[in-house]
Amino acid sequence: MSRIEKMSILGVRSFGIEDKDKQIISFFSPLTILVGPNGAGKTTIIECLKYICTGDFPPGTKGNTFVHDPKVAQETDVRAQIRLQFRDVNGEMVAVHRSMLCSQKNKKTEFKTLEGVITRMKHGEKVSLSSKCAEIDREMISCLGVSKSVLNNVIFCHQEDSNWPLSEGKALKQKFDEIFSATRYIKALDTLRQVRQTQGQKVKECQTELKYLKQNKEKACEIRDQITSKEAQLASSQEIVRSYEDELEPLKNRLKEIEHNLSKIMKLDNEIKALESRKKQMEKDNSELEQKMEKVFQGTDEQLNDLYHNHQRTVREKERRLVDCQRELEKLNKEARLLNQEKAELLVEQGRLQLQADRHQEHIRARDSLIQSLATHLELDGFERGPFSERQIKNFHELVKERQEREAKTASQLLSDLTDKEALKQRQLDELRDRKSGLGRTIELKTEILTKKQSELRHVRSELQQLEGSSDRILELDQELTKAERELSKAEKNSSIETLKAEVMSLQNEKADLDRSLRKLDQEMEQLNHHTTTRTQMEMLTKDKTDKDEQIRKIKSRHSDELTSLLGYFPNKKQLEDWLHSKSKEINQTRDRLAKLNKELASAEQNKNHINNELKKKEEQLSSYEDKLFDVCGSQDLESDLGRLKEEIEKSSKQRAMLAGATAVYSQFITQLTDENQSCCPVCQRVFQTEAELQEVISDLQSKLRLAPDKLKSTESELKKKERRRDEMLGLVPVRQSIIDLKEKEIPELRNRLQSVNRDIQRLKNDIEEQETLLGTIMPEEESAKVCLTDVTIMERFQMELKDVERKIAQQAAKLQGVDLDRTVQQVNQEKQEKQHRLDTVTSKIELNRKLIQDQQEQIQHLKSKTNELKSEKLQIATNLQRRQQMEEQSVELSTEVQSLNREIKDAKEQISPLETALEKLQQEKEELIHRKHTSNKMAQDKINDIKEKVKNIHGYMKDIENYIQDGKDDYKKQKETELNGVAVQLNECEKHREKINKDMGTMRQDIDTQKIQERWLQDNLTLRKRRDELKEVEEEPKQHLKEMGQMQVLQMKNEHQKLEENIDTIKRNHSLALGRQKGYEDEILHFKKELREPQFRDAEEKYREMMIVMRTTELVNKDLDIYYKTLDQAIMKFHSMKMEEINKIIRDLWRSTYRGQDIEYIEIRSDADENVSASDKRRNYNYRVVMLKGDTALDMRGRCSAGQKVLASLIIRLALAETFCLNCGILALDEPTTNLDRENIESLAHALVEIIKSRSQQRNFQLLVITHDEDFVELLGRSEYVEKFYRVKKNMDQCSEIVKCSISSLGSYVH
């Protein structure tokens, strides 16, 4: 069941156009109440609901006045939008919004409806659909589960149309017809009647058409006979053509065999020439290989192979030893890297520790500086100079703590004093506010009471004014009542209702007899039609059997020769399918072999490309390695260059050591010669003869001592360069080995693999060509058989259908046995028409009499209603005159109360003004106290926080200093320096070991290079011997080919080939003549077939058969239509009566529980329907009226009831219609339901609505929407347990409507 959840309104009527003016209302279940004064916008909410659901605008507007007026908004364009969120009949959430645009154009406004959008949840995601208005209307009706007429007239009925149940007859009939959907069913009956007439005309047309179709069918049979004759002549001609073709086939096969042998001889001759060319090339290659070799090995093949294998073992052993050295070198390189890494880490750690030591000293200096600064700020003695001891620092902290406590106490005392003063001011303010609020509540309460009293006073005065002149009206009513009673008595006396009813009863009996007679005639007609259909079907089935026999014969003659040549016999469908399956299997196997070969070929091609790429890559790599070796060494002889470089390094190292020691020796010699006063040489002990000679030696030594550091530096620089170059050359040792491997092993192996792959590719191409030839032979055979399979399948289907036709012929023949057909269809039809004419006459008389009865009853009822209305009006005026004195006293009392309330409100307003002045003064004094308190507190807190921050910084530095000392960072620093020295010693020893291994590896590589040259010589000897063996094989093959050609008798085959070509040409000429005759027969057959394909002859027999079936079935359809018309008409009557009974029961219960008057017991809806039970030309009509019953008297309410009774009756009828027709939609909106109701009926209506809500409370989707201005009515509804909140609709300062949610308990305190 559908229900509405939420709606937003923007720019409609008095609702504002800005986003801030958008109003949103959520609908409660089971009851939503909207309260507000006139003009607040309550009815606009119902109009919006109706528009969003149906697309219809309120009465009296085409849309432009429905949108907020552009002139009021002072805008050129005003956009309005309504959004609704609801659940459809399936419980799924749906959102829809409609938009409108109103534009001000000169002196008029233009209105336009914009595209709407429907949004649904699908698979957890929102799916939006933009639609035109008509599509949205249909979708909304589908989602809500009720028709558009129920939405307009029952659920969302506008206030102006709320009394439609008591409108005039034509309008009331239209609305009830729409609600009951009677119009649609009446149109359906009209359509059935029109279809029946159309079908009757169609039967006549079919009879005329059958005559012409029979002539075309006979002419088509004649053309088919001619085609059969020509096809026989064509078959004979085709037999002659096939005989020529059979004679030609063996000659062609022999010719093909001879041509095959001749091509084989040519192929052998070409092979002999190719072998001679290959022999010459091989002899040339062997000669070139012998010239390239220094000498040829003279021993046996076995000796050569043994020598080659032994040589390979020696080379492999040396290579293994070289690999071991390489591994050892890599191990040492790894160890050196680890030591270098460890050395780097120790250096980093040493730097980090030194940085921490420097930072430790900085922290001590910063701490002492902060202590001096804070002591100066706080005026503490004894802390003018650092560094400070632990005792001084502890004393400093105690003094600072004492100072902080003293400052905090002073600030707290000041804050407490100011807070007390602020509290005093606040108490004074609260007292004045309470007095002001009391006066304000008094004014609000008395203003509300004043409003109610003024409203009651206006109501009382209005009623008094209406009572003027009531006495004269009573006299007029007495006269009218006497006249009405006299007319009623006369009408009852002249009535002939009983006589007419008796006549209607007699006519109905006669009508029943006629109906029975017509049913018997229908049964007889059906039996006659059934036998006629059987004979027609018998003829058509016999013709169908002949056609199928002919089709089977044609298919067999068409494919007999072809299938016999393929299988040896004419197969059935299963045999042909089995043969095709085996042939298809053979084709698939051939295709699989072909695909496998293609795959192998693609793989070989890919392998070839891979080898080519690898070979190119290896050659490029070899070139790169050689360039790299040349760039570093200047030649390809790495070992010699490396040896020379090592000798130079050793020489430079000795020179560096000598220069390093010379400095100390020269210094010692100079000291001995100068300080010790020795006159002899420190080396040779020769005595210097003179002082000048001594000074010359000393000067020479000092000169050498000065030059020694520069020479040492230059030597060390040169030594480092040579060592770097040596390291680079050592790094190229693996590159040199890679060059050797590429030249002697990897590149030759790749070239051998490439030759092998080329041979495999050529073999695969030959195999693929052979399989493709085989596939080209068997596939045409399969295609030919597949073409035949379709016709063979059709033939078997024709054979099955032929058996079915024969069975049906037997069945129809059995049906016609023993049938008496003396009475014709025309005789029965004539009798039926006579009976039908009499039935129509009787029916017309019944209807006429019923109309007379109804007219007399309505006249009498009208007079009774008029009499009752006059009595009721007279009684009402008398009652009102009795209440006049009471109402005058009430008017005086209300006027006195209104004046008293005005005085009291004025006095209270005068007392409020001095209180407001005192409140402003106290509020200003309080704010000044708060400002002083905040300023004083902030200054004290800033001073305390400053001291705390400085103490916190001192503590931070002290903690860092303590952590450094406790962690023992000084000892740890010394430990890391010792470890660094040890790693340097290990690194030096590792370097010496690496130099030794590099030297050994150089020697091994030189030995391996020498062995490789010997290995290449042995390989060339092996290759030469293998080529000599292949040359012997090539010399033998041409001899065998010449021997094979001698056995084929070439000359005799050429002569036979010429004779066969001459015989084949002769047979082909005769074959062409036979084909010409065959073409003539085929042209004649095509001409007849073309004539047979002309519109009048194409499918002439089938058209005749179909037209016969159409005519017979149309007659049967016409009869079914008449039966269906009657059944539908009776179903409409039954549905209408059931629904009216259900609606009247609900109306009766609601009226008795709601209406408090005694003049009307209950009300109900009366509907009168015309009796049409056959497919005649008349339509059924329903005439509706609302009547009120008092005892046995029923009077039309229209024109006889009061305004209050009219409102209550209309409301109850809508409630009943909603409960009956809104099974899928539990929504109902009531707009101002208490209009024109007195207090007693308002209370009973509230009680009835509460009972309805109570009975539907278990229905989760039931929603009642009540809009009213009567707060007493809302209060009555609020006493139930179903209302906690309601909405109040009012105008804001901009005169735009607002919707405010309120509690039901706030009703008594609201001020308008």
UniProtKB/Swiss-Prot annotation:
Residues 200-532, 635-673, 706-734, 776-942, 1043-1075 form a coiled coil. Mg(2+) binds at residues 43, 159. Disulfide bonds: none annotated. InterPro entries: P-loop_NTPase, Rad50/SbcC_AAA, Rad50_eukaryotes, Zn_hook_RAD50. It is found in: Nucleus; Chromosome, Telomere; Chromosome. Keywords: Acetylation, ATP-binding, Cell cycle, Chromosome, Coiled coil, DNA damage, DNA repair, Hydrolase, Magnesium, Meiosis, Metal-binding, Nucleotide-binding, Nucleus, Phosphoprotein, Telomere, Zinc. It comes from the Eukaryota. GO terms for molecular function: ATP binding; ATP hydrolysis activity; metal ion binding; protein serine/threonine kinase activator activity. GO terms for biological process: chromosome organization; chromosome organization involved in meiotic cell cycle; DNA damage response; DNA double-strand break processing; DNA strand resection involved in replication fork processing; homologous recombination; mitotic G2/M transition checkpoint; R-loop processing. One of its GO terms (cellular component) is site of double-strand break. In adult, it is expressed at very low level in most tissues, except in heart, lung and aorta. Expressed at high level in testis. It catalyses: ATP + H2O = ADP + phosphate + H(+). Phosphorylation at Ser-635 by ATM in response to DNA damage is required for double-strand break (DSB) repair. The modification Phosphoserine is found at residue 635. The modification Phosphothreonine is found at residue 690. Disruption phenotype: Defects cause embryonic stem cell lethality, abnormal embryonic development and sensitivity to ionizing radiation. Binds 1 zinc ion per homodimer. Gene3D superfamilies: P-loop containing nucleotide triphosphate hydrolases. Its EC number is 3.6.-.-. Its cofactor is Zn(2+). PANTHER family: DNA REPAIR PROTEIN RAD50, RAD50. Component of the MRN complex, which plays a central role in double-strand break (DSB) repair, DNA recombination, maintenance of telomere integrity and meiosis. The MRN complex is involved in the repair of DNA double-strand breaks (DSBs) via homologous recombination (HR), an error-free mechanism which primarily occurs during S and G2 phases. The complex (1) mediates the end resection of damaged DNA, which generates proper single-stranded DNA, a key initial steps in HR, and is (2) required for the recruitment of other repair factors and efficient activation of ATM and ATR upon DNA damage. Component of the MRN complex composed of two heterodimers RAD50 and MRE11 associated with a single NBN. The MRN complexes dimerize on DNA to form joined MRN-MRN oligomers required for DNA double-strand break repair. As part of the MRN complex, interacts with MCM8 and MCM9; the interaction recruits the complex to DNA repair sites. Component of the BASC complex, at least composed of BRCA1, MSH2, MSH6, MLH1, ATM, BLM, RAD50, MRE11 and NBN. Found in a complex with TERF2. Interacts with RINT1. Interacts with BRCA1 via its N-terminal domain. Interacts with DCLRE1C/Artemis. Interacts with MRNIP. The zinc-hook, which separates the large intramolecular coiled coil regions, contains 2 Cys residues that coordinate one molecule of zinc with the help of the 2 Cys residues of the zinc-hook of another RAD50 molecule, thereby forming a V-shaped homodimer. The two heads of the homodimer, which constitute the ATP-binding domain, interact with the MRE11 homodimer. This is DNA repair protein RAD50. It comes from Mus musculus.
